[in-house]
A protein has these predicted regions:
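Single conserved hydrophobic/aromatic residue that forms the stacking wall/gate
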Residues: 301-310
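Active-site helical microenvironments for divalent-metal-assisted chemistry
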Residues: 1-302
Length: 310
């Protein structure tokens, strides 16, 4: 199948980016990878394009998008450093080199202490944070397509490495959607029966409770609107690995979990946070021991998590 010579990203390229240079990088990557295939049988270029699309969604700069397109060229093709610097500049070369060096680190370990050391090593090697962002995007797409790797042991090794090294790194960077997806994709490989069982239960609950969760959200919004509090209410569904992790850590059954579905109420000030807490406390009964004040203790995230009986 002939590969298109025109870059077609999943979303339009932002007008602030250098679309011509990105197109040039795409054409160069197509030429470099032209004889290579993925385990799925797709042309290899489909992978760097997917990585670049992920980076575009993060609204990153031109050099980072180009690095996404070229991140495997030095390691897996005949492309040279001189070529990349000549065509795309020193900054891109440094980024591609950084990603290549990270890819060469053997990070698989079952030892928690070693895993933490590997995470520190990766952070230390990523002098430019964009190197780590490209690597995380690379790992995310590889995990999305991991089912095409024929060797089960290799799939499990990659999944373990992802769970122990890359998912926690994404969390440290505040990339919680990345973290959640990497964890669930890894868990699906490492414990498929538990993953399938929990997914079935959560899907059933979603259908069974959908009307109730919508009503609760409407009630909360109406209550806060009456009190003239400007806020945003976002529904949150606990991810499968997070559910499993909580069940294991607390030694509880699925039916004992109280936070599979929750709401985030986002407001403009700390004062409003406490006002909202008081308003909702007056409407519903809080579950004893569930309230935590992460504002007064200067936690990373300024939140007031609480569980209510509705």
């Amino acid at each position: 199948m002939a590969q298109s010579t025109v870059y077609k990203p999943a979303k339009p390229i932002d007008k602030n980016l250098d679309s011509k240079l990105i197109e040039k990088a795409y054409s160069f990557a197509v030429e470099c990878h032209k004889s290579q295939k993925r385990h799925s049988g797709d042309p290899y270029i489909s992978h760097p394009v997917a990585v670049a699309d992920i980076l575009l969604n993060l609204k990153l700069d031109t050099s980072t998008i180009i690095t996404g397109l070229l991140h495997d060229t030095l390691e897996d093709t005949l492309a040279t450093e001189n070529e990349i610097e000549e065509k795309f500049g020193k900054e891109v070369l440094q980024l591609v080199n950084g990603v290549t060096k990270l890819s060469k680190i053997e990070t698989y370990t079952e030892n928690k202490f070693q895993a933490e050391n590997f995470r520190k090593l990766i952070l230390a090697m990523s002098k430019d944070i964009r190197v780590l962002l490209v690597k995380l995007a690379d790992r995310l797409h590889n995990m999305r397509t991991i089912q095409f790797i024929p060797q089960e042991k290799r799939r499990q090794r990659i999944a373990s490495e992802t769970l122990e090294i890359y998912a926690p790194l994404a969390g440290r960077l505040g990339m919680h959607e990345f973290k959640d997806e990497l964890e669930d994709l890894s868990f699906q490989i490492l414990n498929p029966s538990a993953y399938s069982s929990l997914m079935t239960r959560i899907e059933y609950l979603k259908k069974d409770k959908s009307n109730l969760t919508d009503k609760i959200k409407t009630r909360i919004f109406s209550l806060l609107e009456k009190n003239e509090i400007d806020c945003q209410i976002i529904g949150r569904e606990k991810k499968i690995f997070s559910v499993w992790n909580k069940m294991q850590n607390k030694q509880i059954a699925f039916r004992q979990l109280s936070d599979i579905f929750a709401y985030r109420i986002i407001t403009n000030s700390i004062e409003d946070c406490y006002s909202i807490l008081g308003i909702i406390h007056n409407r519903w009964s809080a579950v004893p021991g569930s309230f935590k004040d992460y504002i007064s203790v200067s936690y990373t995230h300024l939140t007031l998590p609480t569980i209510y009986s509705v």
